[in-house]
């Protein structure tokens, strides 16, 4: 995921709760790797929030939260389940100030990584959205990754 740093919001998300899929996981701020990709926590049990993007309390822009779908310590990560997201599902995000933000799923996309343009998902000035991202599709051993990204887009309710 290619990302470009911007200003850092003051109140980061700390927890992601998606009851329909049994997801309840911590979220930590992450940045950008040396090759310009969004940094993802090594353990699939923890999600990363793109700290140069928008936070749930922001009036505009996308809040991007991503996690690996598996890792050595967590063979099946919680975000692996987002492939089963359905339009209308509710997702809750808690921030470090203790505020809860509820979102409703608008879409779930399965996009081949070779065809993926992530720039629109990282928008800082678009209509507020929650964007969840993980890997999906088939394992590609020669690339040491999966063939697709699974991307869930949700709109704020509160």
Segments (PLM) and residue ranges:
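Solvent-exposed, non-transmembrane regions of membrane-associated and secreted proteins
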Residues: 1-85, 90-97, 107-158
């Amino acid at each position: 995921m290619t990302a470009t740093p911007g200003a850092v919001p003051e109140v980061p998300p700390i927890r992601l709760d998606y009851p329909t899929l049994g997801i309840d996981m911590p979220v930590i701020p992450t940045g950008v790797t040396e090759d310009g990709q969004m940094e993802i926590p090594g353990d699939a049990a923890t999600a990363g929030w793109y700290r140069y993007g928008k936070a749930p309390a922001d009036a505009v822009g996308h809040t991007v939260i991503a996690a690996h779908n598996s890792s050595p310590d967590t063979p099946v990560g919680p975000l692996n389940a987002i492939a089963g997201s359905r339009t209308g599902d509710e997702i809750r995000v808690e921030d470090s100030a203790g505020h809860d933000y509820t979102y409703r799923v608008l879409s779930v996309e399965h996009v081949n990584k070779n065809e993926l343009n992530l720039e629109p998902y990282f928008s800082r000035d678009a209509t507020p959205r929650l964007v969840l991202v993980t890997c999906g599709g088939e394992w590609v051993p020669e690339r040491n990754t999966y063939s697709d990204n699974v991307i869930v887009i949700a709109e704020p309710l509160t």
